[in-house]
């Protein structure tokens, strides 16, 4: 038997709390990296408890394997390789590969539409 769906206000509070935890993790990383890693673990627990996604802004800022907060230039390396963004975790060596075909496609479409609009005028 299912437990039922959580109210929308609970989910909104959980998302707001996850944003706060990730912002604190970013602020605390310089002085206390272990504390920022703890904030990431707490945010992940919130997302599993309330069955919500971690906000897109923060989804690329932690390692999916070791759950450490990634700060480019300190414990993460970001590279652009073959139409994808490679984020290398400096803690465990895990590589996250994120394609960016959609961005290129939208850019091409916008360029095509602007040329089409110019020709119509």
Swiss-Prot record:
Subunit field text: Consists of a catalytic RNA component and at least 4-5 protein subunits.
The EC number(s) given in the record are 3.1.26.5
Where, by residue number, does Zn(2+) bind? 63, 66, 89, 92
Listed name of the protein = Ribonuclease P protein component 4
What note does UniProt attach to the cofactor annotation? Answer: Binds 1 zinc ion per subunit.
Q: Which PANTHER family match?
A: RIBONUCLEASE P PROTEIN SUBUNIT P21, RIBONUCLEASE P SUBUNIT P21
**What subcellular locations does the record give?**
Cytoplasm
Stored Pfam families: Rpr2
HAMAP family given for it? RNase_P_4
UniProt organism field = Methanobrevibacter smithii (strain ATCC 35061 / DSM 861 / OCM 144 / PS)
Q: Which UniProt keywords apply?
A: Cytoplasm, Endonuclease, Hydrolase, Metal-binding, Nuclease, tRNA processing, Zinc
